[in-house]
Swiss-Prot record:
Listed SUPFAM superfamilies: Actin-like ATPase domain, Heat shock protein 70kD (HSP70), C-terminal subdomain, Heat shock protein 70kD (HSP70), peptide-binding domain
Listed GO biological process terms: iron-sulfur cluster assembly
Name the UniProt record assigns to this protein: Chaperone protein HscA homolog
HAMAP family named among the record's database cross-references: HscA
Role noted for this protein: Probable chaperone. Has a low intrinsic ATPase activity which is markedly stimulated by HscB.
UniProt keyword annotations, A-Z: ATP-binding, Chaperone, Nucleotide-binding
Top-level taxon: Bacteria
Family: Belongs to the heat shock protein 70 family.
Gene for this chain: hscA
Length: 617
């Protein structure tokens, strides 16, 4: 007799089968892959025993060369060797050329304005370059784990926007990987740190990588990792230390600038090696194109001090957002290879008033956290052991009448999240509504970032204010936003998934937060003025419509003249810049039209009761 295997839909017939999953730290300078084996998370090494894979791809031949071999070719083939491609993800060609004018690559724009790199092998975009790095990491994982991966968790900087996150997902798809989740890098570090130490309290995760800086303030409590606030800079990292030192060396050596692409790459490699040496030495002998000299750690630290101070400004802002004082932070976790720089450790320690934790390898901690999370999401470990709460870095809102912003999801709200709010029509007979989605902290639409627009059509004609349109904002676990608008009486709805064509420029996020505080008073005054103008428009339009409908029947010529004068006065005030004056004008107009409103009400009641008997009533 045959035995039938019965299982729940979607479940494995072997429920205890361990699924192969990996966490990938797709870094600006280096990338890593980690996994949980025998209950322990660790990075997976290549055949030479190396965890790090340089995030460098060479396209000089038919096959892409990735990692250390590509790095070795970077000086001789700079235009075909793509370095720090993570900085290019989600950016327009114009933005890249403005921000990184010294890049040696041959760029051209695609039809949608996104960058294409021209190489000997052919045209490549940043997504394709990232995919080639992911393929090598995936192959390493599959060889180490003995089979095909069921899924991966890929880390991204907390400040990556929708376009940059979507680009990361697209790269993984191109590499043939199933993405279980995108995970913020500081949060991944918190997972690795939290499981290792078991501590509870407020933790600061200071993540300074090759190309990005992130600061996260987290609360660890009974297995719950809650991100209280995030901050940082999407274009500040150890690469910038290298460039400053390279410029200093070029000046010391008396080199004529601009340098050729090949010389520039050689100089950067020398600068990087010198920077690394300063972690153990006070001075380094340097040879640059025939010039020999000694560079001291003190000279290097003076060059980079302003950049380190810039990271501490982000730390201060994040603490304020989290409503936490620096002395409340129990531990400071250092993440990213650039935190090996002694000045960084020293200044961070002074800022928080405690020695930063460096016992976990700062290069590997993010990948290890991602590996742990991948193990959970693959079903190898009950997720009840850990609850992860990420946050959105900037408020998401909608434009309302008068160019005002109504915030639907405030910044630092934990994700995934869905929030809904009801809106109505402004004019009689309105059959469509335009939904304008914005991002930012300011009160007026012009001061925020426009994300997308779409229209809801098919609203039944009704009096102004009678329709009920429910607008729902939903942010998934990867930080991607979808917006739905639905008219409640008919069920007609429209939806959009927000994917900006490219990401925020370098300091835009930080500037948006800074401006919201700098201009808080002016913004509230502008909002009050706009609100009064919208209300004045409503009163003016309503009164004009009422006079056109019933003025001849219910008003004398003198009363008409009085109301027209009130309307003209209110229009004049409405076009001014005094919110209080407009508010008073609205009150005066309401008072002047009170008798007219009563007569219209009486007329409506008489019309409704006409022909009815007392018994019916």
């Amino acid at each position: 007799m045959a035995l039938l295997q019965i299982a729940e839909p979607g479940q494995s017939s072997a429920p205890h089968e361990h699924k192969r999953a990996a966490g990938i730290d797709l870094g600006t300078t280096n990338s890593l892959v980690a996994s949980v084996r025998s209950g322990t998370a660790d990075t997976l090494k290549d055949a030479q025993g190396r965890s790090l894979l340089p995030s460098i791809v060479n396209y000089a031949n038919e096959e892409a060369i990735v990692g250390y071999e590509a790095k070795a070719l970077s000086e001789s083939q700079p235009q075909d060797t793509i370095i720090s491609v993570k900085r290019l993800l989600g950016r327009s060609l114009t933005d890249i050329q403005t921000r990184y004018p010294s890049l040696p690559y041959r760029f051209k724009a695609s039809e949608n304005g996104l960058p294409v790199l021209q190489t000997t092998q052919g045209d490549k975009n940043p997504i394709e370059v990232s995919a080639d790095i992911l393929k090598v990491l995936a192959k390493r994982a599959e060889e180490s784990l003995g089979g095909e991966l069921s899924g991966v968790v890929i880390t991204v900087p907390a400040y990556f926007d929708d376009a940059q996150r979507a680009g990361t997902k697209d790269a993984a798809k191109l590499a043939g990987l199933h993405v279980l989740r995108l995970l913020n890098e500081p949060t991944a570090a918190a997972i690795a740190y939290g499981l290792d130490s078991g501590q509870e309290g407020v933790i600061a995760v200071y993540d300074l990588g090759g190309g990005t800086f992130d600061i996260s303030i987290l609360r660890l409590s009974k297995g719950v990792f809650e991100v209280l606030a995030t901050g940082g800079d999407s274009a500040l990292g150890g690469d910038d230390f290298d460039h400053l030192l390279a410029d200093f060396l070029a000046e010391q050596a008396g080199l004529e600038t601009p340098l050729s692409a090949e010389k520039n790459r050689t100089l950067l490699n020398i600068a990087t090696a010198t920077k690394i040496a300063f972690s153990e030495q006070d001075s380094v002998e340097v040879e640059v194109f025939g010039w020999k000299g000694v560079v001291t750690r003190e000279q290097f630290e003076e060059l980079i001090r302003p950049l380190v101070k810039k990271t501490l400004m982000s730390c201060r802002r994040a603490l304020k957002d989290a409503d936490v004082e620096a002395d409340e932070v129990l531990e400071v976790v250092m993440v990213g290879g650039s935190t090996r720089t002694l000045l960084v450790r020293e200044m961070v320690g002074e800022f928080f008033g405690r020695t930063p934790l460096t016992n976990i390898n700062p290069d590997e901690v993010v990948a290890i956290g991602a590996g742990i999370q991948a193990d959970i999401l693959a079903g190898n470990k009950p997720d009840s052991e850990m609850l992860l709460l990420d946050v959105i870095p900037l408020s998401l809102g909608i434009e309302t009448m008068g160019g005002l912003v109504e915030k639907i999801i405030p910044r630092n709200t934990t994700i995934p999240v869905a929030r809904a709010q009801e809106f109505t029509t402004f004019k009689d007979g309105q059959t469509a509504m335009s939904v304008h989605i914005v991002q930012g902290e300011r009160e007026m639409v012009d001061d925020c970032r426009s994300l997308a627009r779409f229209s809801l059509k098919g609203i039944p004609p009704m009096a102004a204010g009678a329709a009920h349109i429910r607008v729902t904002y939903q942010v998934d676990a990867d930080g991607l936003l979808s917006v739905t608008a639905m008219e409640k009486s008919t069920g007609v709805q429209s939806e959009i998934q927000v994917k900006p064509s490219y990401g925020l420029s370098d300091d835009e996020v930080a500037n948006m937060l800074r401006d919201s505080m700098t201009y808080a008073k002016e913004d509230m005054q502008a909002r009050a003025l706009a609100e009064q103008r919208v209300e004045a428009d409503r009163v003016i339009e309503g009164l004009i419509a009422a006079m056109q409908a019933d003025g001849d029947e219910l008003l004398s010529e003198a009363e008409k003249a009085t109301l027209l004068q009130a309307i003209e006065s209110l229009i004049e005030l409405r076009n001014g810049n005094e919110a209080n004056a407009i508010e008073q004008g609205i009150k005066d107009t309401d008072k002047a039209s009170q008798d007219f409103a009563s007569r219209r009400m009486d007329k409506s009641i008489r019309a409704a009761l006409a022909g009815q008997s007392i018994d019916t009533i």
